[in-house]
Amino acid sequence: MKKFASVLVQLKTLALEKIEQKLESKRLELWQNEREILDKQAQLSAFKNPELGGMSLFLQIQQLKSALRMEIEYCQQEGEDLNKDLKILEKDYFLANQELEKAKIILENEKQKEKEILEKKEQALLDENAMILHWQKGGLHA
């Protein structure tokens, strides 16, 4: 049973590490997404409506601004999805951590049982040796 508990702890630890890697990856992806949103917002605010240049330049700038707004909306939606994924992963991490702690407790209990069994065996051997010595002493006096 101790071997099983030990393997269980190893598996739970690996599962936890895998979730940690996914969490780190999602956090990085979210950070990049937020950075992209800020860049696009900066680009959008850089566009000024031309006072000169006519209607065609005005329309081109409006189209660019519209395209940037759509990209920002897409990035923001992507950010919301990443946040949802992150929350799910954080919950998975919490549950995996709980499972790991349970597995560690099982392993500790098994180690304690094994220790108690060894102590009982040692005591039985000591008792047996004491009896043998007692019999030997009794045989010498007779």
Which residue ranges define each predicted feature?
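Charge-rich amphipathic alpha-helical interaction elements
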Residues: M1-A142
